[in-house]
Amino acid sequence: MPIRVPDELPAVNFLREENVFVMTTSRASGQEIRPLKVLILNLMPKKIETENQFLRLLSNSPLQVDIQLLRIDSRESRNTPAEHLNNFYCNFEDIQEQNFDGLIVTGAPLGLVEFNDVAYWPQIKQVLEWSKDHVTSTLFVCWAVQAALNILYGIPKQTRTDKLSGVYEHHILHPHALLTRGFDDSFLAPHSRYADFPAALIRDYTDLEILAETEEGDAYLFASKDKRIAFVTGHPEYDAQTLAQEFFRDVEAGLDPDVPYNYFPHNDPQNTPRASWRSHGNLLFTNWLNYYVYQITPYDLRHMNPTLD
């Protein structure tokens, strides 16, 4: 949240030089507050588990957030009860005339599937096109990052030979960037993906600003300068046991997966893993809600300014 100070306080300019968000008394007196409307497009098979993970992060902000869950796959789910979907999810037709402060598009286990072979690929493109005029800021996670880069920037699918799985170290590139406000210089975050995100590719083919990357030069966190879109290539929402569940699932399926990197104590899958990324995940989502959504969204959502083209 911003700090409120007198208009003429000398510290105002000093802090702004460090990109600290300062709200003067004159601005604060005219600020109107209402709950934020955030739409979550949940593409994960285990929807209830994914809901829990994202809602936990969104609840860590002092801002009041109204959540709407969205699904675009009309096929019968094998992992989520139909009753749950019918009771708590809307279809795109239900909300296409509405505006939202924020949109989160989750990952999906589609890393080895060509885009045009994804059953709901046309619907993904429809939602992203719609979001340009109806959403203040959109956050893409993991596979959704790859999909958005293709749809918005025409970048072909980049696929790794082996799955990247584990907890990796990252470093921030812009210490005063709003989305990385309060981050340690280096931090840990989990990855579970076949998608590849070389930082050089992002720099060469987009105008997006890379805010954090891995030691190997993969982009982890990047965003547009107008804050309308942000991308996180890992899974900061994951629970402590999620990577373990994925690993043992693949073992049982006979896929011979590598043990997730830097995850199990002593690299032994029989040991109980611990989450080493919770503070990072909470801070990332708090920053996104505050600086990318709350501070730039109009009080009256009917006055949305479409600028994403």
Swiss-Prot record:
Its EC number is 2.3.1.46. It catalyses: L-homoserine + succinyl-CoA = O-succinyl-L-homoserine + CoA. One of its GO terms (biological process) is L-methionine biosynthetic process from homoserine via O-succinyl-L-homoserine and cystathionine. The record marks 192 as: Important for substrate specificity. The keyword Cytoplasm applies. Its main location: cytoplasm. Pathway: Amino-acid biosynthesis; L-methionine biosynthesis via de novo pathway; O-succinyl-L-homoserine from L-homoserine: step 1/1. InterPro entries: Class_I_gatase-like, HST_MetA, MetA_family. One of its GO terms (cellular component) is cytoplasm. Homodimer. Transfers a succinyl group from succinyl-CoA to L-homoserine, forming succinyl-L-homoserine. This is Homoserine O-succinyltransferase. It comes from Shigella dysenteriae serotype 1 (strain Sd197). The gene is metAS.
